[in-house]
């Protein structure tokens, strides 16, 4: 039991009283602002407006106000007035939330460094760019030959603000920072402004995404740490963490090791977790749990998770938020893809003496397809085509130079191919490329007051080369006449680690 208690109390940050003074440093807000600019890149928008009002002068004014300690005292007689933020309440609150989120991530970064240093003699790649979206890649590439059912889970919300603060108490041993967090949440925010429940999953306030993502990830980590603990104590393939919570979840690598289930008090529950063929992944506000068990076993999982969230987090969690689906008959919108299980048939010939046998074996594998209708809808919303997919010109870009117009269209096309490089079939992407190329040609023809045919004859191959993807460019230079290599690119699935920056596709509903 002592080992269980040690596991349930993970290796928290041991730093004390060093975070709060950073809230008064100007460079913290500058770093947080630059980080936000780098994270808010867009595919279809060339100049996303992150925060045009940021300036060091406003930061100095904010820090001056924070130095006046009496403004942090909550007065019961004057609760409706807010002399601390003044007339710039929205801007100041956004800056405080960004700066605070940047500061409280420091203990997690320190824990990441310590976890990486524990691997002696192993070369670990720099994982500061890892996000939970990257954990979906091995999930989509896994072999699901023995899996039958899948649990589609909507992670419960809303969580009480005080529970979020108490969760951070185990990570951030800085009472002043926690008091500031509690004051900030209860004085300037309510839960409805941070989360909206109009759509399935989570919809975060656009002005304070990083701040609430951090709180939300802390809460989800508490859920998943207990879940992983129960899984580890019963599985013959024990999971060992090799990265720290950066922005979403843990990443786990499996090693073969027989473990003894010593937790006698958990024997009634642990028998549910003895299935070694189990796959779990989380993306945004959803979780997916696949298992080879029967429908009865998955139903027990469902009620266990409901009771866990209700008892541990005091949440009213209806059972309708967890759906049990048969893996072979269910498709889902997942990470911007339309995912379903595809059966890959394979024929084996076996010969014993004079007799030969043909063995037909079907392997289950996730098939990731490009959702053509939502993608054309996004292009139509950005005025690249009609809702039916017919290319149109973009008049707002007609004042730009020819090279800028071609560069913008080409960059959008390459970004789309870059994000959907994990697709099993890329035929849809070439249709999108056709729409963008013709839209670019129509825009240029409109600018020069000529027809599309005339402009294409004059431009030659220059317009075609601008829309080549990075893989096609490499193959065209290496194997200029090898069409089979291009066919291999068409069929292969490639996952890039930087696709989490592309918010238009990763977060579309």
UniProtKB/Swiss-Prot annotation:
UniProt xrefs under Pfam families: Intron_maturas2, MatK_N
Alphabetical list of InterPro entries matching this protein: Domain_X, Maturase_MatK, Maturase_MatK_N
Keywords of the record: Chloroplast, mRNA processing, Plastid, RNA-binding, tRNA processing
Subcellular location per the Swiss-Prot or TrEMBL entry: Plastid, Chloroplast
BP-aspect Gene Ontology terms: mRNA processing; RNA splicing; tRNA processing
Record carries keyword Amino-acid biosynthesis: no
GO cellular component annotations of the record: chloroplast
Keyword Cell inner membrane: no
GO molecular function: RNA binding
Cross-referenced PANTHER family: MATURASE K
Role this protein plays: Usually encoded in the trnK tRNA gene intron. Probably assists in splicing its own and other chloroplast group II introns.
Family label: Belongs to the intron maturase 2 family. MatK subfamily.
UniProt-recorded name of the protein: Maturase K
Source organism of the structure: Nicotiana glutinosa
Lineage, highest ranks first: Eukaryota, Viridiplantae, Streptophyta, Embryophyta, Tracheophyta
């Amino acid at each position: 039991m002592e080992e269980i208690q040690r596991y349930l109390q993970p290796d928290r940050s041991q730093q004390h009283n060093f975070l709060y003074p950073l809230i008064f440093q100007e460079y913290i807000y500058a770093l947080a602002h630059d980080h936000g600019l780098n994270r808010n890149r867009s595919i279809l928008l060339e100049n996303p407006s992150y925060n045009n009002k940021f300036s060091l002068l406003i930061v100095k004014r904010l820090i001056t106000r924070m130095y006046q300690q009496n403004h942090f005292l909550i007065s019961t007689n004057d609760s409706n007035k807010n002399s601390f933020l003044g007339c710039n309440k929205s801007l100041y609150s956004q800056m405080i939330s960004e700066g605070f989120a940047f500061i409280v991530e420091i203990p997690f970064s320190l824990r990441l460094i310590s976890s990486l240093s524990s691997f002696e003699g192993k070369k670990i790649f720099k994982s500061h760019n890892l996000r939970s979206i990257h954990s979906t890649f091995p999930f989509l590439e896994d072999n699901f030959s023995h899996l039958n059912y899948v649990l589609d889970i909507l992670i419960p919300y809303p969580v009480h603000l005080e529970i979020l603060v108490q969760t951070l108490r185990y990570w951030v041993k800085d009472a002043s920072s926690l008091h500031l967090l509690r004051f900030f949440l209860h004085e300037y925010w309510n839960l409805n402004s941070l989360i909206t429940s109009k759509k399935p999953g989570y919809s975060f306030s656009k002005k304070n995404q990083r701040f609430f993502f951090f709180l939300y990830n802390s809460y989800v980590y508490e859920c998943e740490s207990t879940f992983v603990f129960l899984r580890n104590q019963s599985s013959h393939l024990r999971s060992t963490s090799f990265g720290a919570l950066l922005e979403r979840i843990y990443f786990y690598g499996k090693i073969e090791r027989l473990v003894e289930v010593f937790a006698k008090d958990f024997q009634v529950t642990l028998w549910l977790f003895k299935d070694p063929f189990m796959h779990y992944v989380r993306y945004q506000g959803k979780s997916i749990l696949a298992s080879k068990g029967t429908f009865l076993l998955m139903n027990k999982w469902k009620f266990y998770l409901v009771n866990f969230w209700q008892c541990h987090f005091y949440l009213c969690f209806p059972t309708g938020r967890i759906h049990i689906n048969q893996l072979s008959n269910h498709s889902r919108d997942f990470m911007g893809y339309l995912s379903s299980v595809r059966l890959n048939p394979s024929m084996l010939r076996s010969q014993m003496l004079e007799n030969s046998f043909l063995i037909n074996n079907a392997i289950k594998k996730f098939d990731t397809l490009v959702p053509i209708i939502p993608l054309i809808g996004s292009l139509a919303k950005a005025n690249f085509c009609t809702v039916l997919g017919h290319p149109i010109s973009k008049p707002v870009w007609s004042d730009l130079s020819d090279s800028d117009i071609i560069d913008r269209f080409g960059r959008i096309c390459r970004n789309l191919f870059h994000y959907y490089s994990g697709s099993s079939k890329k035929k849809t992407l070439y249709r999108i490329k056709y729409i963008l190329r013709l839209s670019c040609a129509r825009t240029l023809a409109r600018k020069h007051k000529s027809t599309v045919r005339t402009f294409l004859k004059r431009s030659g191959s220059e317009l075609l080369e601008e829309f080549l993807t990075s893989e096609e460019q490499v193959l065209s230079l290496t194997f200029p006449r090898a069409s089979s290599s291009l066919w291999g690119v068409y069929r292969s699935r490639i996952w890039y680690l930087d696709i989490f920056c592309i918010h238009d596709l990763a977060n579309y509903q």
